[in-house]
């Protein structure tokens, strides 16, 4: 299948042509795809001939619906793209934090030792996620380790979700507090060592984080 006709098939699916017929006009599709109406008509005929859509004319206009073959193609494409994009790693850029990491790591240190099996360095490595779109896209298939919250000196500390990761062979964990102030583009990483020193990192350096 040509890439351009694939884009048209995706467009038809987004317009609702799965499980029902929809009315389309060549003029509307030509604007959406930035091609001539004649080109859209030719692509529709190609999709019909290849068995990806049903197409017929009516008084209302051109009616189209994806066939089972067309739906299966998009499902397969989605699976392949998801595997490529969300395969358990993060590419990011080292940034400076807001200075609260050391305090919180010290408070949770006994529980981190119990649930993750290492004594954490009192601080976090902050990484701005460049790929995939958000930290949650990379972690969507990983199972978190829940570090339970607690109360100390009248102050409540909430649950923390931890995901085991590896950076250049060093084991650590991405931690996501239930009361985080960070946007989904920021990953906070704890480890048994100071990662900036161990990996000779500075702000702006690129890192690859493997979810394990």
Curated annotation (Swiss-Prot):
GO biological process: FMN biosynthetic process; riboflavin biosynthetic process
Region (Riboflavin kinase): 88-212
Note describing how the cofactor binds: Binds 1 Mg(2+) ion per subunit.
The keyword tRNA-binding belongs to this UniProt entry's keyword annotation: no
Gene3D superfamilies, A to Z: Riboflavin kinase-like, Winged helix-like DNA-binding domain superfamily/Winged helix DNA-binding domain
UniProt pathway annotation: Cofactor biosynthesis; FMN biosynthesis; FMN from riboflavin (CTP route): step 1/1
UniProt entry tagged with the keyword Ion transport: no
Named cofactor requirement(s): Mg(2+)
Binding, Mg(2+): 124, 126
InterPro entries (alphabetical): HTH_MarR-typ, RibK_CTP-dep, Riboflavin_kinase_archaeal, Riboflavin_kinase_CTP-dep, Riboflavin_kinase_dom_sf, WH-like_DNA-bd_sf, WH_DNA-bd_sf
Known function: Catalyzes the CTP-dependent phosphorylation of riboflavin (vitamin B2) to form flavin mononucleotide (FMN).
UniProt-listed PANTHER family: RIBOFLAVIN KINASE
Protein name in UniProt: Riboflavin kinase
Lineage of the organism: Archaea, Methanobacteriati, Methanobacteriota, Thermococci, Thermococcales
């Amino acid at each position: 299948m040509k890439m351009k006709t694939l884009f048209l098939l995706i467009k038809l699916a987004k317009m609702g042509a799965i499980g029902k017929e929809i009315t389309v006009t060549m003029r509307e599709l030509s604007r959406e795809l930035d091609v001539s109406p004649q080109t859209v008509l030719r692509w529709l005929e190609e999709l019909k001939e290849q068995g990806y859509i049903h197409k017929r004319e009516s008084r209302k206009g051109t009616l189209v619906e994806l066939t089972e073959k067309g739906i299966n193609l998009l499902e397969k494409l989605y699976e392949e793209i998801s595997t490529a994009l969300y395969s358990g790693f993060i590419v990011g850029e080292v940034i400076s934090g807001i200075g609260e990491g050391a305090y919180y790591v010290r408070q949770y240190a006994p529980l981190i030792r119990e649930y993750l099996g290492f004594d954490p360095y009192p601080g976090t490595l902050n990484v701005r996620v460049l790929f995939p779109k958000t930290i949650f896209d990379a972690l969507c298939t990983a199972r978190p380790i829940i570090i339970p919250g607690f109360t100390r000196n009248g102050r409540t500390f909430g649950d923390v979700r931890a995901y085991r990761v590896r950076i250049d062979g060093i084991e650590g964990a991405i931690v996501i507090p239930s009361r985080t102030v960070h946007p989904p583009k920021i990953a906070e990483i704890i480890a048994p060592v100071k990662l900036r020193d161990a990996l000779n990192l500075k702000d702006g350096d690129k890192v690859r984080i493997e979810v394990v």
